[in-house]
Amino acid sequence: MIDKFLHFDFISKGVIFIETVQTIPQEIADLFQTKGSLLKVEKGTHIFQEGERAEHIFLIKSGSVQISKETESGKELTIRICGKNCLIGESLMFCKFTSHSSTAKAIEASEIYLIHNDLLESFIEDQPSLMMDYLKWIQTENVKNQSRLRDLVLHGKKGALFSTLIRLANTYGEFRTDKEVYIPIAFTNTELANLCATSREMVNRMLSDMRKSNIISVNKGHITIHDLTLLKSEIECENCPLAICRID
């Protein structure tokens, strides 16, 4: 299993890029490429929807995919923003449930591999060492989810927004200094609210206050965090490994 979760590349103009790197076992990624089918999906296309029969597992080759759940009243909670090399639809592997428990939608044009559940399960079952690597990866995902849930619940609405911005920075950010980071994915305030499990109006007010205090700036939905250290101190950041403090 690839245990290097984050890689820093120094390029011109003093910008430091953080790459999203592969965290699933290489053998599984190779199987998608050799035995899977490649889908090209446009922005706004649903890859699968909550309640649909789950027959395939997906690996993102390029692009970004939003994983979300919706209540009966229509309120949406965004669970993950997944990018290159992320596995989606995997929660039902080795499981008796046959329907998707969430919805996956492309938030930009994407290329996605898909493979049938049975093929991937048998491939993992036949290789005990790969099964161990897969279990380690699943456990990392569980800890990541627990950490995000803790931040959403324990630190109030401001803490939920701050932790979401920190996770977006760790996952997709382009670091210009050790404190300042640009998030290249554009978000509306509604989309940020869905990530924070709060209302758009509340996010509007908090972002406005942060802009006035020069903690962030926003240009056409792209957020630049000017003081990441301040955000971390406000939520009593526990300095989790970067493999855990992520949004994907």
Language-model features: locations:
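Cyclic-nucleotide recognition modules
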Residues: 28-29, 80-143
